[in-house]
């Protein structure tokens, strides 16, 4: 693997060598169907609002934030399962029956190479899709905007193979069309394995657009007819091969000119110097050239892509998170005193820590009262909070619950009050009410670690150990992020 890119030559024939990839659940380069993903279901709008804190801006993960035409949010269901929620613009799918039929069809797919579609919501004008949440960003992020290290050649080859396997799986299930395949559609799961977003299997039915990217990257037949074909997907796959080879988003026409002129030094990412052999580089360039053929019928099919990419794989025994230089999802982060107390369900220690924290985490999220808003009712609510704080310190939990309830019922907002009442409920052997308050605290302050820790303690006492551990890790991640420490994925 010592050759550099400057000596690559552009060949004409594609090798069809066979090899067995040693990565988990891969046999002869084919993607396997999985059965441990929940069946597709319909969610209520209220469930998805609760999961995303009312579609809060802080929960947006789509490329262009809230300005994106169809915004994607991260969320967390009641059972602590993380989800991605795609919210289409109003009336993007005017025919609710068509939306449901299409979503149910895509929702039957289950592959380890995809961020599987878990469900949808179709209430009134709302059209939402729910998929598995992938916590480790997009290919675009790791390829074009990397922070610690550029993506290694070995990992780039794994990405294109897994992507080809995902497309081949879809093809085998009769889903041959994928809309606007690009580096933002490739996501990384908890183990840092690449997965294809299922959102791209459904397009916006009203505008009918299959490509939102620059026209320079659009398949030529789509420009002529406005229709997407299975061969159009292969063309887009070719543009992704160029992305991975160059580390940049190069227009296909320019890349093909460089290939024809054998100017591959300019085409290839300088970060890859010395990481691959001339023959491997030539093979990838040849495959990209075939995918980008002007005539659609001259492009390879998905099965040919898998066959060509499988023998190029290297270091198949090395896990993806190691190649990516990212922490493993099972890594254990040292817990803070509060996290440790919540993990042990040590309510006395939790009480001492919450009392010391005071209300400093309420800054910026509590009610800001103007002079004109100081009414007798407001003053009464604030007095109730003060009485609740006194009762909290004196461990009079029934009195504290009553006073904090008066404060909340008065329309006042405070995540700390919700957290304190949550702990009072735990002290009073009322874990369900405690969980509700902890969730409400997170609705008010979505990135507050204390709320996650209290959810963990409540879930544990309710006997939901798996969900408790998920919430505990989430709290640890949020606390580490707040303190500027690299978080555990």
From Swiss-Prot:
Its main location: membrane. Signal peptide: none annotated. Residues 58-324 form the Protein kinase domain. ATP binds at residues 64-72, 86. Pfam families: PK_Tyr_Ser-Thr. It is an enzyme of class 2 (transferase). It is a lipid-anchor. GO terms for cellular component: cytosol; plasma membrane; plasmodesma. GO terms for molecular function: ATP binding; protein serine kinase activity; protein serine/threonine kinase activity. It catalyses: L-seryl-[protein] + ATP = O-phospho-L-seryl-[protein] + ADP + H(+); L-threonyl-[protein] + ATP = O-phospho-L-threonyl-[protein] + ADP + H(+). Phosphorylated by BRI1 upon brassinolide (BL) treatment. Phosphorylated by ASK7/BIN2 and ASK9/BIL2. A lipid is attached at residue 2 (N-myristoyl glycine). GO terms for biological process: brassinosteroid mediated signaling pathway. The active site is at 180 (proton acceptor). The modification Phosphoserine is found at residue 212. It is found in: Cell membrane. Its EC number is 2.7.11.1. Keywords: ATP-binding, Brassinosteroid signaling pathway, Cell membrane, Kinase, Lipoprotein, Membrane, Myristate, Nucleotide-binding, Phosphoprotein, Serine/threonine-protein kinase, Transferase. PANTHER family: SERINE/THREONINE-PROTEIN KINASE BSK5, SERINE_THREONINE-PROTEIN KINASE BSK3. Belongs to the protein kinase superfamily. Ser/Thr protein kinase family. Probable serine/threonine kinase that acts as a positive regulator of brassinosteroid (BR) signaling downstream of the receptor kinase BRI1. Mediates signal transduction from BRI1 by functioning as substrate of BRI1. Functions redundantly with BSK4, BSK6, BSK7 and BSK8. Interacts with BRI1. This is Serine/threonine-protein kinase BSK3.
């Amino acid at each position: 693997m010592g050759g550099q890119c400057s000596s690559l030559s552009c060949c004409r024939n594609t090798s069809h060598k066979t090899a067995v990839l040693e990565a988990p659940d891969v046999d002869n380069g084919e993607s396997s169907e999985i059965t441990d993903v929940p069946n597709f279901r319909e969610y209520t709008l209220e469930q998805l609002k609760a999961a995303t804190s009312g579609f809060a801006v802080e929960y947006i993960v789509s490329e262009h934030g809230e300005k994106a035409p169809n915004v994607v949010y991260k969320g967390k269901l009641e059972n602590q399962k993380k989800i991605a929620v795609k919210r289409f613009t109003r009336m993007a799918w005017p025919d609710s029956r068509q939306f449901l039929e299409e979503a149910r069809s895509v929702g039957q797919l289950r592959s380890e190479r995809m961020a599987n579609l878990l469900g949808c919501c179709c209430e009134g004008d709302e059209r939402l899709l729910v998929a598995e949440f992938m916590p480790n960003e997009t290919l675009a992020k790791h390829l074009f905007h990397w922070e610690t290290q550029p993506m290694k050649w070995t990992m780039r080859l794994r990405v294109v193979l897994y992507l080809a396997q995902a497309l081949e799986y879809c093809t085998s299930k009769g889903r041959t069309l994928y809309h606007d395949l690009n580096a933002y559609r490739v996501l990384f799961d908890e183990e840092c394995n690449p997965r294809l977003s299922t959102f791209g299997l459904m397009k916006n039915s009203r505008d009918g657009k299959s490509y939102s990217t620059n026209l320079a990257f659009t398949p030529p037949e789509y420009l002529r007819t406005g229709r997407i074909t299975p061969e159009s997907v292969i063309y887009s796959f070719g543009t992704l091969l160029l992305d991975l080879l160059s580390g940049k988003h190069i227009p296909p026409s320019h890349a093909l000119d460089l290939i024809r002129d054998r100017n591959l030094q300019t085409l290839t990412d300088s970060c890859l110097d010395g990481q691959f052999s001339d023959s491997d580089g030539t093979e990838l360039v040849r495959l990209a050239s075939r995918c980008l053929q002007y005539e659609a019928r001259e492009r390879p099919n998905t099965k040919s892509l898998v066959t060509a990419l499988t023998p190029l794989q290297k270091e198949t025994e090395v896990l993806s998170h190691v190649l990516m230089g990212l922490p493993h999802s099972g890594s254990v982060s040292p817990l803070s005193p509060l996290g440790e107390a919540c993990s042990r369900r040590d309510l006395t220690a939790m009480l001492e820590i919450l009392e010391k924290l005071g209300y400093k985490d309420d800054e910026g999220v509590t009610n800001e009262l103007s002079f004109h808003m100081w009414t007798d009712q407001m003053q009464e609510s604030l007095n109730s909070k003060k009485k609740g704080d006194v009762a909290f310190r004196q461990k009079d939990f029934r009195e504290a619950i009553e006073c904090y309830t008066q404060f909340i019922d008065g329309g006042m907002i405070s995540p700390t009050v919700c957290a304190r009442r949550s702990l009072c409920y735990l002290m009073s052997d009322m874990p369900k009410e405690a969980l509700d308050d902890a969730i409400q605290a997170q609705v008010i302050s979505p990135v507050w670690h204390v709320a996650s820790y209290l959810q963990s303690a409540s879930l544990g006492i309710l006997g939901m150990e798996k969900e408790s551990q998920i919430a505990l890790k989430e709290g640890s991640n949020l606390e580490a992020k707040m303190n500027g420490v690299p978080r555990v994925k």
